[in-house]
């Protein structure tokens, strides 16, 4: 899991 995907919610 990457932080970029996590912040694109």
Swiss-Prot record:
The lineage of its organism: Eukaryota, Metazoa, Ecdysozoa, Arthropoda, Hexapoda. It comes from the Eukaryota. This is Extended FMRFamide-2. FMRFamides and FMRFamide-like peptides are neuropeptides. GO terms for cellular component: extracellular region. Keywords: Neuropeptide, Secreted. GO terms for biological process: neuropeptide signaling pathway. It is found in: Secreted. Belongs to the FARP (FMRF amide related peptide) family. The keyword Secreted applies. The keyword Secreted applies.
């Amino acid at each position: 899991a990457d932080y970029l995907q996590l912040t694109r919610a």
